[in-house]
Amino acid sequence: MAARYTEAVLAALGVLSVCSASSSSGSGASGKAGGEAEWAEPWDGAVFRPPAALGAVGMTRGLGSPPPGNAETVDLPVLLWWSPGLFPHFPGDSERIECALGACVASRDRRARADPRTRALLFYGTDFRAADAPLPRLAHQSWALLHEESPLNNFLLSHGPGIRLFNLTATFSRHSDYPLPLQWLPGAAYLRRPAPPLRERAEWRRRGYAPLLYLQSHCDVPSDRDRYVRELMRYIPVDSYGKCLQNREPPTVRLQDTATATTEDPELMAFLSRYKFHLAMENAICNDYMTEKLWRPMHLGAVPVYRGSPSVRDWMPNNHSVILIDDFESPQKLAEFIDFLDKNDEEYMKYLAYKQPGGITNQFLLDNLEHREWGVNDPMLPNYLNGFECFVCDHELARLDAEKAHESSPRDIPVLEPHIAQLSHMDCPVPTPGFGKVEEIPENDSWKEMWLQDYWQGLYQGEALTAMIHNNETQQSKFWDYVHEIFMKRNKNL
């Protein structure tokens, strides 16, 4: 991921500093679709000696903490941020952090990798490139993954061999070690914001506005949403802004800036509030992957017409607050239902009942918002970057204690078994067409050429890096040889 993306992440989280970053290299060998075989782990306990996950932890930071390098930090475990440009501290290359179980030193100095005190490497998923992974993998170090962004940024992590390279995870999945499924939802109050009066929206309809809004400038994505919207437009008016399927110009120059479309700019929010229904379609389909495309319409009092996380019902404020595209057998049937709601105010308002006092009845959602230890623009809580960092710190402190206990009594206290991430920590299936069947799409279709190949190449790359670690390889330059060998073995019968 280029430097501007990591800077944007830090800025959005309110981190004080952003160190300069260089662009990470991409990878692009082609691959053909083939099922992911049952994966037998090719390593044994000697290859990995990291750890078991420990429960939720807190994070506090003392402003007067001494700088790393003196007697108070010399024996502390080191956490090394490996991704360029992502280091949530200011200033310098290292900082002592105070967490629930004790202190660690966070660093971005890659020279520390070989130091026995360096207990964990922290990777940002979008930046992680198997071809550039630090080799050989050192037996005493955990690998920790932060990947709250779209799976399209790195499909290696959507396969078992890729995600199981890591010991600790912070992803959008509720099943990850440090889950971030509600990263785009500040709190329940965000959902309770009053909706505009229906008479105002009726006036916009009389002025020629469609009932349904589509605002996208990221086209040709793995979810193939534009293909579905194009078909839906045959049956119901859709006002499409942005670069994808555009049929209307935003009313002001400011709103024509695509950078504004992902913000909560007051002018943008007022404009979007004119619409009763918003097409809310994620760029990729994974359980628990939900973004502002879902939450922003609800904040504005519009009804999301949603395709994205298959588990989205688990997170809704009640059982009648979103229209799910996949509940309808065709775009035509969906269009007919939206048209019905558009003409029946009483039925439409049932979708906004969660905004009334006591209207949020989903206790699972409320509990997750209340008990998460990180916050969204909350000065009383750490952001999830620092929160995950402390989670890793406490994990490594506990692992050190377990190792010491085993050394003191090896017959009575067994070696701590390594904790390995599972496929459920991402849970992203192979991309499918937004409309129609994959076999009906021409082979030269841009979606088919790009995303199916990218998805399956992620599998090959994860298998290649796993094999290199198992073989204790030290030369990154051999990576593509491994990929080629795996590709040939998988496709030898084609």
Curated annotation (Swiss-Prot):
Which molecular function terms from Gene Ontology are attached? alpha-(1->3)-fucosyltransferase activity; fucosyltransferase activity; peptide-O-fucosyltransferase activity
- Please name the pathway: Protein modification; protein glycosylation
Which cellular component terms (GO) are annotated to the entry?
A: endoplasmic reticulum; endoplasmic reticulum membrane; Golgi membrane
Transmembrane spans? 8-24
Q: What class of enzyme is it?
A: transferase
Write down the EC number. 2.4.1.221, 2.4.1.-
> Quick check: keyword RNA-binding in the entry?
no
Listed A to Z, the keywords are: Disulfide bond, Endoplasmic reticulum, Glycoprotein, Glycosyltransferase, Membrane, Signal-anchor, Transferase, Transmembrane, Transmembrane helix
Pfam families linked to this entry = Glyco_tran_10_N, Glyco_transf_10
Q: What is the annotated localization of this protein?
A: Endoplasmic reticulum membrane
User: Membrane topology for this entry?
Assistant: Single-pass type II membrane protein
Q: Which residues lie on this side of the membrane: Cytoplasmic?
A: 1-7
Residues with an annotated glycan are N167
Q: Which GO terms describe its biological process?
A: fucosylation; N-glycan fucosylation; positive regulation of protein secretion
**What does the record give as the reaction this protein catalyses?**
L-threonyl-[protein] + GDP-beta-L-fucose = 3-O-(alpha-L-fucosyl)-L-threonyl-[protein] + GDP + H(+); L-seryl-[protein] + GDP-beta-L-fucose = 3-O-(alpha-L-fucosyl)-L-seryl-[protein] + GDP + H(+)
Broad class of where this protein is predominantly found: endoplasmic reticulum
Disulphide linkage map? C390-C393
Q: Write out the similarity annotation.
A: Belongs to the glycosyltransferase 10 family.
- In Swiss-Prot or TrEMBL terms, this protein is called GDP-fucose protein O-fucosyltransferase 4
